[in-house]
From Swiss-Prot:
PANTHER family: 30S RIBOSOMAL PROTEIN S16, SMALL RIBOSOMAL SUBUNIT PROTEIN BS16M
Keyword set includes Magnesium: no
InterPro entries in UniProt: Ribosomal_bS16 (IPR000307), Ribosomal_bS16_dom_sf (IPR023803)
Assigned keywords, A-Z: Ribonucleoprotein, Ribosomal protein
Organism name: Paraburkholderia phymatum (strain DSM 17167 / CIP 108236 / LMG 21445 / STM815) (Burkholderia phymatum)
Annotated protein name in UniProt: Small ribosomal subunit protein bS16
GO MF annotation: an example: structural constituent of ribosome
Any one GO CC term of the record: cytoplasm
């Protein structure tokens, strides 16, 4: 089963997450199928969240599940998008 979840990057105490479509059996930071976006929780200026909505819609259309954290981030991105 394909799942869309966060893969951690960055250095110690400076997290950076890629939003990736991956097989549910692969490790958190392991092999993935496609990078769909990113989330930078420590960003002070600039964008902290970017999601390719078209690719996210595609993966959901073929049966991919979202992790709870990615669901929360997608809702946050959709709220911010109409304001922009």
């Amino acid at each position: 089963m394909v799942i869309i979840r966060l893969a951690r990057g960055g250095s110690k105490k400076r997290p950076f997450y890629n939003i990736v479509a991956t097989d549910s059996r692969s490790r958190r930071d392991g092999r993935f199928i496609e990078r769909v976006g990113f989330y930078n929780p420590v960003a002070t200026k600039g964008e902290s969240l970017r999601i390719a909505q078209d690719r996210l819609t595609y993966w959901q259309g073929v049966g991919a599940q979202l992790s709870p954290t990615v669901q929360r981030l997608v809702k946050e991105a959709q709220k911010a998008q109409p304001a922009a």
